[in-house]
């Protein structure tokens, strides 16, 4: 779908000086993200910098891909690209240098990201509010997948939420169009995508012909995180991440994942054997809702062919049983400050369970660190 990058629509770019930068709210390999406001209207926006210095052949293809995808996607639960701006160009710049400098993607401003909210102990989600978060997240995934787009970087920091409680999938810097394999020729997408803690087992094993299930695995990790308040599998390496996945989701074998032994890495890596699936058992100390546990379990299925998709997930009993999904606006209205992962203290990592919610008794079985490596 997103093939012809010549059709990217930005024949004229305004200068970014029309916006006043207010604060830095994000940092990554791509550059920086700033909160800003339009100098004339006062409208708040987010400015995402696209670094150009190292591009010897014009505009970076990854940025072109992101822009094209963002222009294609128009949905309430997907971040909205307003325009593209640039730094002021010198009057003496030649045609080559006019393509250099810094480009900014301008987005509608969202007050929070989910990682920032979960980092704040004063932010407490009810089950009904968690249902609303996941319903919006899955609606966004359903829409992008229906439009043949993979996000490829699902994580809590890339889930934005406005002050009015509207969720937006964000950061399409790794996104790409996908298609079914043609003429028995498998796709050869890169598997070096998705932040390690949210990366599904098929990518860790080297799969290059993948599809929407990679994003649903990330959705499952995020859903569990709504209760645990920190990423549930925090590996240090790809091998370690596969070990943690095996300890939570059971040993990776052809019995539970047909043809998994086709992967060269499956033969090379020493993965844990004899591990039983413990998703529900390990999470029940945090997640008291039976339907929620069942949906998380279905999203974290090892075999991508058996993993639930966004349509099935949205029809799950979790969303259609009491309490019904509830608006986030009232809860968020009690918090005046924006919350972003970049501005929050480092989230708990490695060696310890995340803090147990005050109203939940800790399950001794779930804290026996002698039996398993770091998972939650």
UniProtKB/Swiss-Prot annotation:
Enzyme class name: transferase
Keyword Transmembrane helix in record: no
UniProt domain Protein kinase: residue ranges: 19-319
A biological process term (GO) from this entry: positive regulation of transcription elongation by RNA polymerase II
A Gene Ontology cellular-component term: nucleus
Record's subunit section: Associates with cyclin-T to form P-TEFb.
Protein name: Cyclin-dependent kinase 9-B
Protein's organism: Xenopus laevis (African clawed frog)
């Amino acid at each position: 779908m997103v093939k012809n990058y010549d059709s990217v629509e930005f024949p004229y770019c305004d200068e970014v000086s029309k916006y006043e930068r207010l604060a830095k709210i994000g940092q990554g390999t791509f550059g920086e993200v700033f909160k800003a406001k339009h100098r004339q209207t006062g409208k708040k926006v987010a400015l995402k910098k696209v670094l150009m210095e190292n591009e010897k052949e014009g505009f970076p293809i990854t940025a072109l891909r992101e822009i094209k995808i963002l222009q294609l996607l128009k949905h309430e639960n997907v971040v909205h690209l307003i325009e593209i701006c640039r730094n002021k160009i010198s009057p003496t710049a030649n045609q080559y240098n006019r393509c250099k400098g810094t480009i900014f993607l301008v987005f509608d401003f969202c007050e929070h990201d989910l990682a920032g909210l979960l980092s704040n102990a004063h932010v407490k989600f009810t089950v009904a509010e968690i249902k609303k978060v996941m319903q919006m997240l899955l609606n966004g995934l359903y829409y992008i997948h229906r439009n043949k787009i993979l996000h490829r970087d699902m994580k809590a920091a890339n889930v934005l939420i406005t002050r009015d409680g509207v969720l937006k999938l964000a950061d399409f810097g790794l996104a790409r169009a996908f298609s079914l394999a043609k003429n028995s020729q498998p796709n050869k997408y890169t598997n070096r995508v998705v932040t390690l803690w949210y990366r599904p087992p098929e990518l860790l094993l080297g799969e290059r012909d993948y599809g929407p299930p990679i994003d649903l695995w990330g959705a499952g990790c995020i859903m569990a995180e709504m209760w645990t308040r920190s990423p549930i599998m925090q590996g240090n390496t790809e091998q370690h991440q596969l070990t943690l996945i095996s300890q939570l989701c059971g040993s990776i074998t052809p019995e539970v994942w047909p043809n998994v032994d086709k992967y060269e890495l499956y033969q090379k890596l020493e993965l844990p054997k004899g591990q039983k699936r413990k998703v529900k058992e390990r999470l029940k100390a945090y997640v008291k809702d039976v339907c929620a546990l069942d949906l998380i379990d279905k999203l974290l299925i090892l075999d991508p062919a058996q993993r639930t998709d966004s349509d099935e997930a949205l029809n799950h009993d979790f969303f259609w049983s009491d309490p019904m999904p509830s608006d986030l606006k009232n809860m968020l209205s009690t918090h005046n400050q924006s919350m972003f992962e970049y501005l929050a203290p480092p989230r708990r990592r490695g060696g310890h369970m995340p803090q147990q919610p005050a109203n939940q008794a800790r399950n001794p079985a779930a804290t026996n660190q002698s039996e398993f490596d770091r998972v939650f």
